[in-house]
Structures are given as structure tokens and as C-alpha cells.
């Protein structure tokens, strides 16, 4: 039977006209459809077949037109009337409603319409659409709104707006009414964004959208674009097709969205219709072959049933209806009404049936009565009925326990979309990823973390990579979010597990879990070459100033020792010969001449002994304090010498952010879209503000699209570029080959990575609890060690330091050898000079002695012997210096 019905539906209205046009059982019905109402027309055709009877058939005459064009509507209506139609089904808008109602009242032609209800009394107009005013006012009172914006489409009439304004005046509501019906389609997106930005300035976060589906979708798109669909905003969609719009894109934003639904999909009658509706071929019936139907299409479908029931009732009452001879000119003056039109109007108003939109019944004015409208709210798991409104009961809330934001029911049967970003070591493609599918293609810290979170929360998930490869920032001009944050905000993903920094601007549009990793902004530079120790690196343990002070102290001590030795009588003594006899000379000697004082001080400083020592108390005091001084200096020097000689040092040109800000030779930048750039842009600290001023004006640009690009730029810059990034990533890259980058200085700030979910998502609390549990169990630390250090390619931090400090190279002590060789050479040179000097002096002495011998040969021998001994003693023994 269903197959036969399906085949019969495919018969075109033209064929019906040819077959039944001359039959007395054929009832001509007019149809005025606006262009683009494909689904409504398909529902009309299906109703024509579905509700046809053996007693008679409805034969349609269809015109497609612009309902906003009164001239086109007039021509079409008159054309239908002249064809002898019994009733007309059609649509109108604000511009054509008066034309149609005027013709209907004048010509007595009934007009059945699913368009918006009109105010006042219009005979011969049958309103299929229930009035929404009562339900809307009840919902406003239920939410206790006293201040809100009302966006209305003037093409739908102003009756609902007037009712709201009347109630506002009575109850002292503050209503901002804005007409969006006249917005230019070419600039509608820009104008919608501007409109909501103006509302934001007025703190208007409660908005009623009194528009049809297409305009609501356009507005919602721009609301999402500028991020006004998050927690803290509440929208009421004031039409009867809450589920008709594309709710998926706003479902996970966090904003409260409420509305009204006339088609109850839980009703068995609706379910049966949808089952048949979904089997129709869309090519033959545009808009069909779906599991949903627009409320205007549902009203159209049951308008056919209303007409069928009306004519059936007339047949039962044996009232003969005929247009033979009554097909006149609608523009005749005076107009000639159809005599039997009153009977048809009465029959239509008396119809009472159960349809897709509930109980269908009309009052004497052709308006719907005894109807029920479902009250809907949008939750993260889809639209949910919270109650209903009727003329008798008014608003009744049936959902006594609203689902909390922590409700995870339904997740078991849903695959959660996890957005992330390719960033080592958080998420990486496996080497053989081309041979794998799904989540198995990825590896990394966040991949393991996602598996742990899913295990604790009990849901299935699918990893997806952010389309633009960015973390998420809002464009300053368009206010559009990009990256992973954008995918959460615009409903493309359910959760983001990635190195996503928790920031204030992001927290305004998405929810974050507790941090799963703490970090801060750090500086990455190219690792400088290890500095080779200098020839005189043994001097490094003490500063240049200390060495100079030691030299001056050495000279000063030697001079003081020389002086006190000269002034102290206890430092002088007489010379003795080897046989113990006292010398015949009355002169006393002093061992501490200037050169011996220098020699004593040098020997004490070098921790070596000396053949002479002070005899006087004053001299010994000088020697004692000098020994104490040298003890401390030499001990300190020795303590530092090992470190300076054995450890290879790397001299970094930059040690902190202050160093970067004070120079321009080394460029520095951040990721072009991320929290690091936002930190510098918003910072009020002088150093960071100065760095931001440089970065935003630098040419070429110092910003990079990805972290990999930033690292490559550091490595290729030969030390002329520094990259500012999170410390965790900096530490990881430092452990990867070619091991040529390093982190310098401390962290510039303190922050954390968190798992992000859309505002108000049911995943928020379970994910947060899972992170805390993993932290307490030490799983997060194990994951970090696994991906940072266990898989490192540059060795553990400070590994091998003991081996490197245990051996010295020749370059470490080359200076000591140079001094030794220099000292030996100097000694040889001094010895040569002494030899030459002595030889020359001896030659002169021998010459003088020979001349003296010639003059006094008798006494020359003894004098010569004594002089020779005395002179030799003075030269090679203890010198005697007179002052």
C-alpha cells in the first residue's frame, strides 16, 4: 500500500488537471507560493495525494511569485479566481497581506495560509499558524527578564512587537526594539556584527529574535563570529520552528538558547509522517527525504487536510458547491462576490482535526484556538523540551529537574571530537602513519593524555588537527576566533587537548580545566660555541683588580720590610769569619736590603722557604701579616682554579629579557597567533612593553606562523634571532638534535596549559576531575619524563660533567708553561749579563792592580789578597748597602 501511495504521489498536478478537470468530483484549489518555498510546495503536493478521497479530488493551480510584490499578487489572485477555484492556499507578507485580505473579503474567496497571524478581523482568511504572543510573554515572565533587546522582522508584521511593548509599559520592562527586516543583504553580515557590538556596549545580553529561519541563521552566524554565543548570553527565537534552524553551530557555545516548537517529533502521528517523508525522492520533491520538516511545511501539509475535511463536510451536508458560471473578473466594478463562498468559509472554520502541529481548530475569525506550543531549550546534547504553553494552562514547565552542566549521559554513544595541533612532543605523526588510521596515526604527550582522560571519563573520541594549525586568537577587526579556540567556539569540536595556554580572553569564550602543566615564557637562542680557555686562564679565578692589588701589596710589603729592617737596631749584626774570630771592621750588616726584601716577600707569597728571616719584632710583624694575607689569597685562588681550568664555559650574549630589550643586534619574536604574543601586547611592564614596541614594528617581521618555523629561524640566524616561547617547549627542543639551541634566563611569567571545552559543556567537570586525579597519581609527571627526557637525543641534563671536569688539556695550562719557559730564558739572559758585567769589572780590577804593583811592589801582594776576598764577598755573598 505504501508503495502504491508513493507512486501516486509522483503524479504531477498538471496530469491531475487533465484527468479530473472536467469531472464533477474535481475541486479546483489555487496555490500562491513564494519563490524558494520548495519544501512547502512538496508538502502541499504530498497532502494533495495523501488526503484525496474517492468522493472528490483537489486539483491545484499553482503560481510561483514574489509575495512582496503587490502587483504580482494581484495578478495571480485574479488569475486563480477567474479559473474558478473554490479556495486559495498561499503565503503573504507585510506588503501583500492587505491586498489579499481585501480581495478575499470582497470576492468571498477563502484564503488558507501558514503565514503570520494578522491582527483584527479578516473574513475569509483562515490562519493555520497559531498566535505566538501569549507564549512569548509567558516565557519572558518565566525567565524574569526586565531588560532585553527585541530584534524583529517587519515583514512578519508588528503584532507580536506591539504586544511586547504593551506589556513592557505595564510591567516597566526596558526593551530595545530593532528592526532587522530592512537590512541590506549585501552588507547584512557587517551590519549584524555592528548591531550586536552596539548591544554589547549597552550590556544587552538578553535578545529576542522575532524572525524566520533564514534570517535567524544569518544572525546566529554573526553572533558566533563575534563570540556572543558564550556563557552569559541568552537568546529567545520567537518563531514556531525552534529545531528548523542550524542549532549545531551554537549548541556548544555556552549561551542559553530558548524557543518554541509547534511540530512535536515525539508524537506518533508526526513520527509516521516523517517515516514516509524521508522515503520520498528529493529530486522529485525538493526538501523531502529528511528526518525533519519545517513548521511552515507542516502547516502547509495540514492545510490540505483542512480543505479536504471542509469539502467532505459540505458533501455530507448535501450542500452543492459549484463555480460554473461564477468565474468572473475580480477587478470588476462593482465587484461581484461568489455566492457560495460563505458556505466554504463556514465549513473551513468548523474543521477540527489532529495534525502535525497538534489540535487544529479555528474560531469564528479563522484563527487557531485550543493549540499547544512546546517550550524548548538548547542543551549541549541537543534541543530539549522543558514545558508547553496553551491558552488554558498558560506556561507549564514539565522538566522538573533540568540537566546540570556535569551530566555526561549520552557520551557512551557519542564520539567526542578532540581538536589538537601538531606540536612536538605533544602531538606528532608516527613514522608509519600512512599505514594507520584514526587515532593510531598520532603519538605524543597529549595523545597519551587524551587516552587517559577518555578512560577516566568513559567516552570514545576522535583526534582531529586544527584546520589552520593555530592555537586560537581573536581577530581585532572581525572579532573572529581562529585555531582550536575557534573550533570550540563555533561548535566544530567538543574538547581541545593541546598545549593551550589558559588566558583571560580565552576563558571568556571557553572553559578550561585545572592546569595539567605549569610553565612560563622563556627565551630560546642558538647555543654559542664553547669558549676555549685562554693561554693565561690560570689567572681567571681572581679578578683583574685583585691581581693588581696583589702586585701593589707585594711591592708595598717589600718596601715596608726594607724600611723597618733599616730602622730597627735588632736587624743589624756584625760579620764573622769562618774560624769564629770577629772581624776587625767596626761596620755592621743588614740582610734585608731592597732586593732581599723583595725576594723574601716573593718566597712567602709562593709558599716557599727563604734563607733569611726577620730578626726584629717589627720585621716579624710585617712577615706575619704577609703570610696571613698570602694564606687566604692562595687558598681562595686554589679553590676556584679547578673550576676555571676544567669546565668549558659557553659565553651567552643574552642572559635575560632586559638584555634583549637593551639591544637591537639580535632580533626576537613570538608565535604570530598565541598567548605569548598576547602577553607582550597586554603587558604594562616597561621592559615587556618596550619589547612589544620593537616586535610589532620590526622589519622583516619577527613573528612566525608555527613553533617549528621559529626554531628553524633560531638555528639559521647564527645567533642573530631569539625566539620567545613556552619554557616546556624550549626545554624539549633543547633535548632534540642537532642540540644547538638553549634556554637562557628565567621564565618571564607563570601560567599553565589546560584542557578546553565549550562554555557550559557537560564534559567540563568530568575532564577537570580527571586532570586532578592524574596529577595526584603522578601520571602527568611520568608522561612528561617520557616525552621530554627519556626520549631525549642530547643526553640527560648535565650528563657527563664529571668526565669533562676530570681531565685538563694543554690549552688549560699553556700559560704556565709559557711563564716557565720565559722565566728560564730570562734567567739565562740575566746570567749572561752578569757574566759579561763581572768579566768586564774583573778586567778593570786586574788592570788597576797591575798598575799598582808596578808602583809599590812590596806591599801589593797582601793588599791584593784582602781586597780580592772583600770584593768577592760583597759581590757574591751578603751585599752591604749604605743609606
UniProtKB/Swiss-Prot annotation:
<keyword id="KW-1071">Ligand-gated ion channel</keyword>
<feature type="signal peptide">
    <location>
        <begin position="1"/>
        <end position="24"/>
    </location>
</feature>
<feature type="modified residue" description="Phosphoserine; by PKG">
    <location>
        <position position="717"/>
    </location>
</feature>
<keyword id="KW-0732">Signal</keyword>
<feature type="glycosylation site" description="N-linked (GlcNAc...) asparagine">
    <location>
        <position position="370"/>
    </location>
</feature>
<keyword id="KW-0813">Transport</keyword>
<feature type="transmembrane region" description="Helical; Name=M4">
    <location>
        <begin position="813"/>
        <end position="833"/>
    </location>
</feature>
<feature type="glycosylation site" description="N-linked (GlcNAc...) asparagine">
    <location>
        <position position="413"/>
    </location>
</feature>
<feature type="topological domain" description="Extracellular">
    <location>
        <begin position="638"/>
        <end position="812"/>
    </location>
</feature>
<keyword id="KW-0407">Ion channel</keyword>
<keyword id="KW-0812">Transmembrane</keyword>
<feature type="modified residue" description="Phosphoserine; by PKC">
    <location>
        <position position="683"/>
    </location>
</feature>
<feature type="binding site">
    <location>
        <position position="499"/>
    </location>
    <ligand>
        <name>L-glutamate</name>
    </ligand>
</feature>
<feature type="intramembrane region" description="Helical; Pore-forming">
    <location>
        <begin position="592"/>
        <end position="607"/>
    </location>
</feature>
<dbReference type="InterPro" id="IPR028082">
    <property type="entry name" value="Peripla_BP_I"/>
</dbReference>
<keyword id="KW-0564">Palmitate</keyword>
<feature type="binding site">
    <location>
        <position position="506"/>
    </location>
    <ligand>
        <name>L-glutamate</name>
    </ligand>
</feature>
<keyword id="KW-0628">Postsynaptic cell membrane</keyword>
<dbReference type="GO" id="GO:0004971">
    <property type="term" value="F:AMPA glutamate receptor activity"/>
</dbReference>
<dbReference type="GO" id="GO:0004970">
    <property type="term" value="F:glutamate-gated receptor activity"/>
</dbReference>
<feature type="lipid moiety-binding region" description="S-palmitoyl cysteine">
    <location>
        <position position="836"/>
    </location>
</feature>
<keyword id="KW-0472">Membrane</keyword>
<feature type="binding site">
    <location>
        <position position="726"/>
    </location>
    <ligand>
        <name>L-glutamate</name>
    </ligand>
</feature>
<feature type="binding site">
    <location>
        <position position="676"/>
    </location>
    <ligand>
        <name>L-glutamate</name>
    </ligand>
</feature>
<feature type="transmembrane region" description="Helical">
    <location>
        <begin position="617"/>
        <end position="637"/>
    </location>
</feature>
<keyword id="KW-1015">Disulfide bond</keyword>
<comment type="subunit">
    <text>Homotetramer or heterotetramer of pore-forming glutamate receptor subunits. Tetramers may be formed by the dimerization of dimers. May interact with MPP4. Forms a ternary complex with GRIP1 and CSPG4. Interacts with ATAD1 in an ATP-dependent manner. ATAD1-catalyzed ATP hydrolysis disrupts binding to ATAD1 and to GRIP1 and leads to AMPAR complex disassembly. Interacts with GRIP1 and GRIP2. Interacts with NSF via its C-terminus. Isoform 1, but not isoform 3, interacts with PICK1. Interacts with CACNG2. Interacts with GRIA1 and SYNDIG1.</text>
</comment>
<dbReference type="GO" id="GO:0005886">
    <property type="term" value="C:plasma membrane"/>
</dbReference>
<dbReference type="Pfam" id="PF01094">
    <property type="entry name" value="ANF_receptor"/>
</dbReference>
<dbReference type="GO" id="GO:0015277">
    <property type="term" value="F:kainate selective glutamate receptor activity"/>
</dbReference>
<dbReference type="InterPro" id="IPR015683">
    <property type="entry name" value="Ionotropic_Glu_rcpt"/>
</dbReference>
<feature type="binding site">
    <location>
        <position position="675"/>
    </location>
    <ligand>
        <name>L-glutamate</name>
    </ligand>
</feature>
<feature type="disulfide bond">
    <location>
        <begin position="78"/>
        <end position="330"/>
    </location>
</feature>
<dbReference type="GO" id="GO:0035235">
    <property type="term" value="P:ionotropic glutamate receptor signaling pathway"/>
</dbReference>
<feature type="binding site">
    <location>
        <position position="501"/>
    </location>
    <ligand>
        <name>L-glutamate</name>
    </ligand>
</feature>
<dbReference type="InterPro" id="IPR019594">
    <property type="entry name" value="Glu/Gly-bd"/>
</dbReference>
<feature type="glycosylation site" description="N-linked (GlcNAc...) asparagine">
    <location>
        <position position="406"/>
    </location>
</feature>
<feature type="modified residue" description="Phosphoserine">
    <location>
        <position position="880"/>
    </location>
</feature>
<keyword id="KW-0449">Lipoprotein</keyword>
<protein>
    <recommendedName>
        <fullName>Glutamate receptor 2</fullName>
    </recommendedName>
</protein>
<dbReference type="GO" id="GO:0032281">
    <property type="term" value="C:AMPA glutamate receptor complex"/>
</dbReference>
<feature type="modified residue" description="Phosphoserine">
    <location>
        <position position="863"/>
    </location>
</feature>
